[in-house]
Amino acid sequence: MPSAFVHSRSSTARSGGEAMETFLNAFRDGYARVAGARERWDDAQKASTALLGAVVNAFERMPALERGATREDVLGNDEFGKRVVEAQYASLDRLFTRLREECDEFERLTRELERAKTDAWMRTRNLTPPPKRAGGERAGPQPSIAECVLGLEDVWRMHRDECALKREIVKQAATCEDVEDLKVLHRLYCAQPNLDPEELRTIMDRVPVKSVEADLHR
């Protein structure tokens, strides 16, 4: 085989790999944004789970407070007992207000994930020349374009569904009158059934996010 032909093929393969690396660098930026959004999601999950837990505790105390409010020998006088119950209901209102605010934060984060997914699709559609095999071809150890894009799509879809579930749970909890039903809602909220931790970890490992330290030493 002529050496010039071998050199040509080698150069073409090398330039193709470099082009793919450049293209994947753009995806790394998208994955970095997704990683940041997911960290804020975890923070919102911790805060809102605690709030819903406080709602459960307040509901558990409410029957005893209402019974005590009708007995002067327990709380001293009837008016004081009523004020205690009213204060507890006011506290519940504040808790649900904060829960709705956390749901708003989940929706904002879901929109961020949607933008990352949409940007990835647009970047792929505008790629010239079009990727081979509809983006399903890998370049060495690098994930394929299709894997990168579909990963972002799956992350957005899972969080979109979980966001809708959280909103519905908070809505139902606000009108729930049975503390056991409320506990079930709380467990469902904590479980985040639409988010598969292992699948999310696999997706986020698909395109490694470059560290700040690595960028500083380039």
Model-found features: residue ranges?
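Extended, amphipathic alpha-helical coiled-coil scaffold segments used for oligomerization/tethering
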Residues: 14, 18-28, 52-154
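N-terminal alpha-helical scaffolding segments that mark the starts
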Residues: 2, 6-54
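Charged, alpha-helical coiled-coil and adjacent rod-like segments in eukaryotic scaffold subunits
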Residues: 115-218
